[in-house]
Amino acid sequence: MIKLDGVSKQYIYGARVFAPVDMTINDGEIVALLGDELSGKTTFLKVVAGVTDSEGKVLFDGEPLAKKPDDVIMIFDDLALFANRSCYYNLAYPLKIRGANKDEIDKRVKAAAEKVGITASLYFKARKLDSIDKKRLAIARLFLRDFKVALVDDITRGLKKEDAKTLWQEVAPALQDFAKEGKIVIFATRDKDEAISIADRIVVTHYRQIKQIGTLEQILQNPSNIWAAQAFDEDYAFEKARLKIAYGKLVATTEDGFEIDLSHLDGKVVKSYIGQDVYVGWASDCYDVSGERKAKVEHAYKSENCYILTCGNRRVKCGEKQDEVGTLPLLGKALLFDDTNENSILSDIVAAYLF
């Protein structure tokens, strides 16, 4: 079990990568770090691995993880290959410095190469490999020796779309197998589909901040902020409205005068927001398409299981093609966010999620 106790990272020039984090990662758990470039994913992995200094404590089974280097394997984003050495040398080197004998090294190197499908390239220089095989060479290190924690940094980054898909289909089952053996797996990715496919929990990151930690279901149903919601639904809708109590229930009045019934949130909103401007947010598949505020559909196209209807800056998911569509949320589907920092103003989320 890994325990993060008040862990954060601040550089000498003052930039803080993420605020103090408390988190427990259980044996056999797969955790995805999801975020765009410069969101702090790599720094998070390096802090956990102990290869960069940080504030707070990173403990593994009660002891500092940095003092257990043999328990951790990290596949870096830059792959850290010896470009002018053979693939064989790249795999043999970490075993050699740990004192393995020649026969043992040969056996493990060839077995690891076979696992990832680069046996035919073992004696080529690493720089001669194409992009996807360089990634496979780096991944092969996971099969060289036993470990308890695997840290994998954005392994499909820089590949063409089809190559990235192919590589992930090869890597994902291996990571799942490691987890079934009780190993902890933490991987970074920019691709929400990769995160969703195998992660037990997801850490949503953005611009050096951790926006939310939770299961996919938790994040979709109760996003801590608009960014966390948009991480899985790029068309997540939000608009400014004035929050008030009317007719004995919670209501939000939009800037164009329409009222959104928020009775499902009665008693759940931080009280200081009553009478204030807020953001009302809802998922792109939660529009009341037959509702009273209609907009003309400018474009429509069929996706995998629905139509995507474009109305101005809105993209509405709908079961059928229409000429006009409602642009307010379905009853019971709207959530509320601060209109300045975009954080949730629902009291249970605010209380549960404090970084």
Label every PLM stretch briefly.
Residues 34-36:
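The feature captures the beta-strand-to-loop junction immediately N-terminal to the Walker
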Residues 1-4, 8-20:
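A short, flexible loop at the N-terminus of ABC-type nucleotide-binding domains that lies
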